[in-house]
Amino acid sequence: MVVEEENRSMEEGLLQHQNDRDDRRITACVILSTFVAVCSAFSYGCAAGYTSGAETAIMKELDLSMAQFSAFGSFLNVGGAVGALFSGQLAVILGRRRTLWACDFFCVFGWLSIAFAKNVFWLDLGRISLGIGVGLISYVVPVYIAEITPKHVRGAFTASNQLLQNSGVSLIYFFGTVINWRVMAVIGAIPCILQTIGIFFIPESPRWLAKIRLSKEVESSLHRLRGKDTDVSGEAAEIQVMTKMLEEDSKSSFSDMFQKKYRRTLVVGIGLMLIQQLSGASGITYYSNAIFRKAGFSERLGSMIFGVFVIPKALVGLILVDRWGRRPLLLASAVGMSIGSLLIGVSFTLQQMNVLPELIPIFVFVNILVYFGCFAFGIGGLPWVIMSEIFPINIKVSAGTIVALTSWTSGWFVSYAFNFMFEWSAQGTFYIFAAVGGMSFIFIWMLVPETKGQSLEELQASLTGTS
């Protein structure tokens, strides 16, 4: 009897060891699925950086005023808000994969409308359509990646979304000043066309399948993601039990997310998006050439160096997010962005006083690199990583929609107001951004939880007090 018990214990121990090893396995399917999902993020980055390099050429060819071009730039955020409003519901009704197809439709139409625009109407329509597409992307891509990846690499894989966005921005910055703006719009559509094809070869999210009660499909999806020879019964059971428990606990009405147990997650999600946008990132990204021009730095040289610089910084975040955790990177990012903004403001103050005029262009440019380097490894992408992790499945639609909508509406405000603020006071604009960075540090320190190393079910249970 004792021998049988010992044998059983050994078998259970070996099985647990095997399951732990399987949980840490990264399959080709996970890599392919993540790559396909982030193709549209590359297009998103192209859209974000597009107005900077194309500003002079578009305004000249289509005879646009500064107000018209500012509106064109900000319409990406207007469309993004519309896309964000419907993103969660679409992801539930259609599933994650088919929602990605919807993203591709809006993005390809938007890029081609811009590429062949003969007047401001088609230009703006294309920008709005592109915005709707990237508004959907901003929700569904990080959610899909978080739902398919093993917990020990979830942060890095989800952060690859930001890496591809930065790569898109870099491409536009590097080539935008030397390639015709219409050709660049066509190039921006290519990743979405590739994604449209790639979606045929990737599995649906097992957590979405669990939500719609497709038990066999949950295991089938997990087998593709974890390996055919892997025992996925434990993970499948955990996903289905947690999903069922949450849905029984709440009927998933819009008001559910305002329950006391979800209050912290909602405040964290909304707060991080406000930090990301009100720190000035959209305005600086959209109109960086105007900043270079004001500082007296070469627009072409500045854009090309920026394009090379930003990708390695995003890679730092990708490598460290599952080693150091989300909080340390967010805190370091907030400090660095605040210092960078402060020093840019000081530079423009010295320029106005005609102090060290020969050094001001270099000083402004270096601190823009500091700002964006710190943005890239932290606040640029980690708010979306955390958003994809902290909301339980029963409120993920409503809460995720509100959080994404917050990002896009605040981004619209910054992107539209930036040119007018910059004309009012270059230094004042960056002092405001520096103050936001300082407040961001306090917010992150006091409220943002560490999410690394936990399954989505474990994390959400700890945040909401569900056992």
UniProtKB/Swiss-Prot annotation:
Where is this gene product found?
Membrane
Q: Which domain of life is it from?
A: Eukaryota
Q: Which GO terms describe its cellular component?
A: membrane
One function term, GO molecular function aspect = sugar transmembrane transporter activity
Q: Which InterPro entries match?
A: MFS_dom, MFS_ERD6/Tret1-like, MFS_sugar_transport-like, MFS_trans_sf, MFS_Trehalose_Transporter, Sugar/inositol_transpt, Sugar_transporter_CS
Listed PROSITE patterns: MFS, SUGAR_TRANSPORT_1
Q: Where is it predominantly found? A: membrane
Keywords linked to the UniProt accession = Membrane, Sugar transport, Transmembrane, Transmembrane helix, Transport
Which parts of the chain span the membrane according to its record? 26-46, 75-95, 105-125, 128-148, 155-177, 183-203, 266-286, 301-321, 328-348, 359-379, 402-422, 428-448
Its placement in the membrane is given as:
Multi-pass membrane protein
Give the UniProt family note.
Belongs to the major facilitator superfamily. Sugar transporter (TC 2.A.1.1) family.
Primary role: Sugar transporter.
**Protein name in the entry:** Sugar transporter ERD6-like 11
* Source organism of the structure: Arabidopsis thaliana
